[in-house]
UniProtKB/Swiss-Prot annotation:
CDD domains: NTF2, RRM_SF. Transmembrane segments: none annotated. Disruption phenotype: Reduced DNA methylation in some of the targets of RNA-directed DNA methylation (RdDM). One of its GO terms (biological process) is regulatory ncRNA-mediated gene silencing. It comes from the Eukaryota. Residues 383-394 have a biased composition (Low complexity). Induction: Probably regulated by the microRNA MAV8. This is Nuclear transport factor 2. Gene3D superfamilies: 3.10.450.50, 3.30.70.330. The gene is NTF2. PANTHER family: NUCLEAR TRANSPORT FACTOR 2, RAS GTPASE-ACTIVATING PROTEIN-BINDING PROTEIN. The keyword Cytoplasm applies. It comes from Arabidopsis thaliana (Mouse-ear cress). It is found in: Cytoplasm; Nucleus. Residues 207-226, 238-289, 361-460 are annotated as: Disordered.
Amino acid sequence: MAQQEASPSPGAEVVGRAFVEQYYHILHQSPGLVHRFYQDSSFLTRPDVTGAVTTVTTMQAINDKILSLKYEDYTAEIETADAQESHERGVIVLVTGRLTGNDNVRKKFSQSFFLAPQDKGYFVLNDVFRFLEEKEVTAQARSVPINGTTRDVQAPIEPERVVVSHEPEVEPEPVASIEEEDLDNVAEVYDPSDKDEGVVVDVEPIEPPTQISHNEILSVPQGDAPKHSYASILKQMKSSPAPTTHVARNKPRPAPVNQKLTAPPAEPAARPEASAHENVPNSSHVDVEDDGHSIYVRNLPFDSTPTQLEEVFKNFGAIKHEGIQVRSNKQQGFCFGFVEFETSSGKQSALEASPVTIGDRQAVVEEKKTNSRGGGNNGGSRGRYFSGRGSFRNESFKGGRGGGGRGGYGRGGGEFSGRPKSSNPRNGGEGYQRVPQNGGGGRGGRGEGGRGGARGGGSS
């Protein structure tokens, strides 16, 4: 009965996240320990230098194959990691990302695992790795010139249409039915990918109703007025027979946008680009580059407080007023924080001192990287993976810096812990050790990392 109650506790996504974090961290930090994720019945498939794919089995052969590929000379950038429950309570994990070598060449790859259950967790039964060919999927979107005509800008993008009722006369109720989020799409900044060096402005031509010009429609999202001011305009329109005069007088800048609609392709790019940014001052797609002197601290205890972080990091330099944030997600099993220093020297000192002890954890200090798609200036939603040795662009993948624990990780998202019964790779480790079901992680084996969570190492 105990086993039946414990088995459904960790979901496939929890198991997948914990495994991916530990696997890639150890793969690039301590590749000589990766074979402990496998057993003699496991199969591992890898391409060689010629592109031919070979499959090996047994822990010794798997260890030899992994060591021959020199993973310590690469860094992994994980883009996606998906997991599903499979046969006999197993878990399938599909990972995509990029490997960057010492020559700074980035290669896209795909890797799939089948995690088979065992008494103390899971082990890798199947492992298939493939490099993928880069395809210019978004090339057309990138090549769209900002200074082109409206027809050229429309080509690669199909935005939401502005719904305007084509009535012979403008009535208050049809105008009031225009939703604000639809009007926001009249001029929107489009970011096709992280790698684009610029933005593409999408200006949607509108077939206006009677008595409403292009200038008046496009001027609604311009200026510094908040969205709710447009609602007040709609209220005035209900009581006024000439609502268009209010829109046109309040917005002084429709002319540049109108010129862009009729301008030839040789129009300079500066004016429409600036106009687009003014049109959408609150757009969540605009990247914020300046983060001051901030650091990102992961693997914090769940009960961490800003005061606790201040006691540790004030030793490295002056901290800005209210410059400390602590966030946690107990459901996903992680806690992290941000610290903003007054000077770059304080930030650099904290980075060099990583890892630091906070509570009962070895917290890892990294430079705060902003790629806000809806995050604003406060660190925002860190919903995208970022590059690093075995690190990930999703907070649920933040883990420790352990140099590789001994054994495996628990089904509840615990540590890569436990000791193998022999150093000989043929004898194998004990697999991933089961830990308490609350995902908090028990005390791990010996390694260079901290404790708890779904992590790559035990306490030192």
